[in-house]
C-alpha cells in the first residue's frame, strides 16, 4: 500500500461506531503499517440538528419523512446518517460543489409536505444561503445536520498530542 513509506499518521475513517478490538487488530494486520506509523480509527457522529436560520434546535413536532439534501462527494454517507434518524428518507444529491438553482428548489419543494423535514450539510447550508435560495423552504422544516469526526478507542488526546509534537519538531 502506498502509504506505508510516506505517512507518519494513518486515519481509518468512517468505521462503525462499535468497532471491536478484534476488528481493529484484524484491520491493523491487513494494512501492514510500520511500527513508526501511528494508526487511528474514526467514525462519523451526528450532532444535534439545528435550523438553517439561527441556532434553534429541531422542533419536537412529529415528521414522517426526511429529505437528505446534499451536494457532496459521497452523498451515500450523508443519507446513511439521515437514515439513522428515520428510515423514511429520500436523498436529493447533487455533484460536489453544485450551485443550486431555482429549478433545484422546485424539485425539492415538490417533495416537501407538512410532515417532511429537510436535512442538509453545513457546507450546503452556506451555499444555499449565499445563493439566496434557502428562503424558499419553510424554516420550521429546514435543518442543518452537523456531522463530526470522532476518534474511536479514546484516541483523540493521543492524536492531538502527536499532531502538536509533529508541528513543533
Predicted regions and their residues:
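Short, aromatic/basic amphipathic alpha-helical patches
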Residues: 22-33, 82-83, 129-139
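Redox- and metal-dependent alpha/beta enzyme cores, enriched for Fe-S-associated oxidoreductases
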Residues: 52-55, 61-104, 164-166
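A short, acidic, amphipathic alpha-helical segment used as a generic capping/interface helix at domain edges
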Residues: 99-116, 123-126
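Short, flexible loop segments at boundaries between secondary-structure elements
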Residues: 95-99, 138-169
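Phosphate/Mg2+-binding loops and adjacent switch elements
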Residues: 1-34
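Short, conserved loop/helix-junction motifs that constitute active-site signature segments
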Residues: 1-6, 32-34, 60-62, 112-113, ...
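G-domain G4 guanine-recognition motif of GTPases
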Residues: 10-22, 42-49, 69-74, 95-99, ...
Amino acid at each position: 500500500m502506498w502509504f506505508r513509506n510516506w505517512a507518519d499518521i494513518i486515519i481509518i475513517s468512517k468505521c462503525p461506531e462499535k468497532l471491536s478490538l478484534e476488528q481493529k487488530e484484524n484491520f491493523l494486520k491487513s494494512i501492514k503499517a510500520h511500527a513508526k506509523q501511528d494508526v487511528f480509527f474514526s467514525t462519523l457522529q451526528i450532532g444535534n440538528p439545528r435550523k438553517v436560520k439561527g441556532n434553534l434546535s429541531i422542533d419536537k413536532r412529529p415528521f414522517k419523512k426526511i429529505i437528505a439534501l446534499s451536494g457532496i462527494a459521497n452523498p451515500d454517507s450523508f443519507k446513511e446518517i439521515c437514515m439513522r434518524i428515520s428510515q423514511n428518507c429520500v436523498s436529493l444529491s447533487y455533484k460536489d460543489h453544485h450551485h443550486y438553482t431555482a429549478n433545484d428548489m422546485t424539485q425539492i419543494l415538490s417533495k416537501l409536505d407538512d410532515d417532511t423535514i429537510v436535512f442538509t450539510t453545513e457546507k450546503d447550508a452556506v451555499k444555499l444561503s449565499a445563493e439566496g435560495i434557502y428562503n424558499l423552504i419553510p424554516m420550521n422544516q429546514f435543518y442543518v445536520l452537523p456531522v463530526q469526526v470522532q476518534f474511536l478507542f479514546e484516541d483523540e488526546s493521543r492524536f492531538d498530542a502527536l499532531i502538536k509534537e509533529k508541528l513543533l519538531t
